């Protein structure tokens, strides 16, 4: 009788599926600089890695203007086809948006079976589909993907079925992509209706937070700047923090106590990126608007990234587009533990960068190690208290509407005590609210003649 030896060490490990190999393509026009194109291509490579692919090669075509048929011209397409065959690449990713006709023309001209041509927006949508966890996130991704994909089905018919799974095809699924336009429109309408309900619930939650009177701070910044890590370090939130682009799609809010004892609400938000598709901004508007409703913006930057200045520009532009560009802002340079060189020099650089604006404050931290986080908390406290005062109001019971006014004006009410004749409320208010209720401050100094 045969003897079967059980030995775990003899087990053959399961083969990991091979990552799809991709050629990255961009064009350098008269309106671009070589440095900008290189930076954008570096970012595209990171996006591909996050999506589960690997870079086989890069191609940059210098042209005075894009070619209408193939973007890069017929000669360069032939060169691209040879490159894909030699490198066994199954994917071509363009660092710009392509028209449906350009995608079809290039796939036909390259002539490699099962090779896909996608653009930067399709890749970003794919990553969002990969990382969507909550019901809201999945609905937002599907809506954005359908809105972007629907016009790109033009003339392809059932050819879409040959794509199979993989990068650029995640999300709604093949059955939806092969549906006719009327079916897709019905699905888009249904998604918008579902999201309207979700957004209503989000507004209710936001109003509930408003009634608490606690200052709201939105942590915003470029994707992978360390926003989730910072929220975890400050509050122990325990949310996913990965070294990947767009690891966080759903905002998370946690209470945080400042050194002086005052509580605030910290919200982690979706990361920004250059060339963020506008249909994606539209689909995720309710999520991105957490920054709009914040009292203070904590703008986090990865100081170890060589493209930090460009990322700051992109983040500020998107904040302005969302209507949050004028908010009081604390600029926080993260990952200082990775920065080689003189730390004092780095601090001076940060201070010099923002010395011309009182509304801008900046400091360096490491969210990973906690270095500088105490100073960050103190800076937030200082920013919050600007123009505010802590007052003990003494309100006659007959004028209890003044207490309701405190809440409606979103004052930070610490305590309320009801007496036989008076209501005693301790609250932190700004100058405007204090002016409305100053008659209930027993310690107020009354100017002569008032």
Task: Tell me the role of every PLM-derived stretch.
Residues 121-141:
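Short alpha-helix plus adjacent loop in nuclease-associated cores
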Residues 1-120, 124, 445-450:
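N-terminal accessory targeting/assembly segments
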Residues 31-36, 66-70, 131-137, 175-176, ...:
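Flexible beta-alpha connector loops of hexameric P-loop NTPases
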């Amino acid at each position: 009788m045969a003897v079967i030896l059980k030995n775990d060490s003899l087990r053959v490990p399961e083969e990991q599926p091979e990552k799809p190999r991709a050629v990255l393509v961009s064009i350098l026009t008269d309106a671009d600089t070589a440095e900008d194109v290189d930076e954008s291509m570096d970012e595209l490579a990171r996006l591909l890695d996050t999506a589960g692919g690997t870079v086989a090669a890069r191609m940059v075509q210098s042209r005075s203007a894009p070619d209408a048929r193939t973007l890069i011209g017929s000669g360069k397409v032939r060169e691209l086809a040879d490159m894909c065959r030699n490198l066994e690449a199954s994917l071509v990713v363009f660092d710009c948006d392509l028209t449906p006709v350009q995608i079809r023309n290039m796939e036909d001209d390259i002539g490699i079976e099962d090779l896909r041509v996608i653009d930067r927006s399709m890749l970003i949508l794919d990553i969002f589909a990969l990382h969507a966890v909550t019901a809201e996130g999945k609905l937002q991704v599907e809506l954005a993907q359908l809105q972007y994909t629907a016009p790109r089905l033009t003339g392809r018919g059932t050819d879409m079925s040959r794509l199979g799974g993989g990068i650029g095809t995640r999300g709604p699924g093949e059955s939806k992509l092969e549906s006719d336009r009327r079916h897709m429109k019905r699905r888009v309408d249904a998604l918008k209706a579902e999201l309207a309900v979700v957004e209503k619930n989000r507004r209710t939650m936001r109003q509930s937070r408003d009634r608490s009177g606690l200052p709201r701070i939105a942590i915003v910044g470029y994707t992978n700047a360390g926003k989730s890590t910072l929220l975890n370090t400050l509050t122990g939130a325990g949310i996913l923090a990965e070294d990947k682009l767009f690891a966080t799609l759903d905002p998370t809010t946690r209470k945080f106590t400042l050194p002086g004892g005052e509580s605030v609400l910290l919200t982690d938000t979706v990361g920004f990126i250059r060339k963020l598709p506008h249909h994606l901004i539209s689909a995720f508007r309710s999520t991105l608007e957490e920054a709009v409703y914040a009292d203070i913006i904590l703008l986090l930057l990865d100081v170890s990234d060589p493209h930090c200045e460009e990322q700051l520009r992109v983040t500020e532009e998107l904040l302005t587009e969302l209507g949050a560009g004028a908010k009081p802002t604390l600029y926080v340079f993260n990952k200082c533990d990775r920065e080689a060189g003189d730390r004092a020099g780095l601090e001076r650089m940060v201070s010099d960068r923002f010395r011309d604006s009182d509304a801008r404050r900046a400091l360096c931290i490491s969210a990973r190690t906690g270095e500088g986080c105490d100073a960050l908390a103190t800076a937030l406290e200082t920013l919050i208290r600007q123009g505010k005062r802590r007052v003990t109001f003494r309100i006659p019971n007959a004028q209890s509407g003044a207490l309701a006014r405190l809440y409606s004006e979103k004052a930070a009410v610490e305590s309320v005590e009801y007496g036989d004749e008076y209501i005693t409320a301790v609250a932190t208010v700004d100058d405007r609210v204090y002016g409305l209720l100053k008659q209930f401050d027993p310690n107020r100094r009354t100017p002569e003649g008032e």
